[in-house]
């Protein structure tokens, strides 16, 4: 089955074709980051307009790369939530209209299920059950995965997501959007012996929930103190970026290890935009070796929003009997736990 995947939940237009027999055939990603950077974040109206403008041309490019015609597609999968309503509507409308014209099924896919399954596109794959850390600008969750659609939430952020905390911290020291890659780049110039240290929120108590608002406040306090004392130079910013990144990474690693031990599992996947962070990957690999556990992740280009993960997730549900929806349905908010389980046939 050859499935066209459309991802338009936020500020990336991702298009891909996944073949259940031959794997990923082609993919393209168009990022709107440059347009939104001047506003310091995503502007929903601009995002939806750009998805409308770019989706059809990208579909043509992906078909050409795969050496296919539209008539050779067997199904279309599109992101139907969670995300920005206008952006979701753009992709869903195009996807369903094209499917109707071709006489093939169209299936709405959960954005975070796409992220969760993205590491399955790689040669090295975990076997279910495993623990998933979903970490992005909008989500920070630990989930036990027993099968496709068999998800149990173990913990989540009670306030800011990790990616959102990176964005806000970056803005405090004058770095552009998106903040995660900017903080990571600047942190490489930081001095680990600067004396700056930020809290690892909620790691001193039981449980698997996260909170990053206090860490963000501690960072802001340090920045204001540096400004008041005329110390907020480039080296201070680099030191602060390193201390902040280290605090976020340590918090995520501690909770991941705790989740694996609590559930008696030895496999972890990390997915979502923050999973591309090199320090996070290195620390997870180092710490999980101590408990003889393994970590899996997607290649960097599939950590951020992309069509490949949507095509793959849609294909898994379609080949295992899930039928296309009769009407257009998108959801700005959509808990993973509400997805139906799907046993492999």
Curated annotation (Swiss-Prot):
NCBIfam families: gcp_kae1, T6A_TsaD_YgjD
Cofactors (names): Fe(2+)
One GO-annotated biological process of the protein: tRNA threonylcarbamoyladenosine modification
SUPFAM superfamilies membership: Actin-like ATPase domain (SSF53067)
Highest taxon of the lineage: Bacteria
Catalysed conversion reaction: L-threonylcarbamoyladenylate + adenosine(37) in tRNA = N(6)-L-threonylcarbamoyladenosine(37) in tRNA + AMP + H(+)
Broad enzyme group: transferase
Pfam families: TsaD
Protein name in the entry: tRNA N6-adenosine threonylcarbamoyltransferase
Gene3D superfamilies documented for this protein: 3.30.420.40
Main location: cytoplasm
Family membership: Belongs to the KAE1 / TsaD family.
Intracellular or extracellular location(s): Cytoplasm
Binding sites annotated in the UniProt record for Fe cation: 111, 115, 305
EC number, as in UniProt: 2.3.1.234
């Amino acid at each position: 089955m050859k499935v066209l995947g459309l991802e338009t939940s936020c500020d990336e237009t991702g298009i891909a074709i996944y073949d259940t027999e031959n794997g990923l055939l082609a993919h393209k990603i168009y990022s709107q980051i440059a347009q939104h950077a001047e506003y310091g974040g995503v502007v929903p109206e601009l995002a939806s307009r750009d998805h409308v403008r770019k989706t059809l041309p990208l579909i043509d490019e992906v078909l050409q790369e795969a050496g296919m015609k539209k008539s050779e597609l067997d199904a279309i999968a599109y992101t139907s939530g969670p995300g920005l309503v206008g952006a979701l509507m753009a992709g869903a409308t195009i996807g369903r209209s094209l499917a109707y014209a071709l006489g093939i099924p169209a299936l709405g896919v959960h954005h975070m299920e796409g992220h969760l399954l993205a590491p399955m596109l790689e040669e090295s794959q975990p076997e279910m059950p495993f623990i998933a850390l979903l970490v992005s600008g909008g989500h920070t969750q630990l989930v036990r995965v027993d099968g496709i659609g068999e998800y149990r939430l173990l913990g989540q952020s009670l306030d800011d997501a990790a990616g959102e905390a990176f964005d806000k911290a970056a803005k405090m020291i004058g770095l552009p959007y998106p903040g995660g890659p900017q903080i990571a780049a600047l942190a490489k110039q930081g001095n680990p012996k600067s004396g700056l240290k930020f809290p690892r929120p909620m790691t001193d108590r039981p449980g698997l929930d996260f909170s990053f608002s206090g860490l963000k406040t501690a960072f802001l306090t340090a920045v204001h103190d540096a400004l008041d004392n005329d110390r907020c130079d480039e080296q201070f910013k680099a030191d602060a970026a390193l201390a902040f990144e280290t605090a976020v990474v340590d918090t995520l690693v501690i909770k991941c290890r705790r989740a694996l031990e609590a559930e008696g599992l030895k496999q972890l996947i990390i997915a979502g935009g923050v999973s591309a962070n090199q320090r996070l990957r290195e620390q997870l690999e180092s710490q999980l070796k101590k408990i003889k556990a393994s970590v899996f992740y997607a290649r960097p280009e599939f950590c951020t929003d992309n069509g490949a993960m949507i095509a793959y997730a849609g294909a898994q549900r379609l080949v295992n009997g899930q039928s296309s929806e009769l009407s257009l349905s998108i959801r700005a908010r959509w808990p993973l736990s509400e997805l139906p389980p799907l046993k492999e046939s």
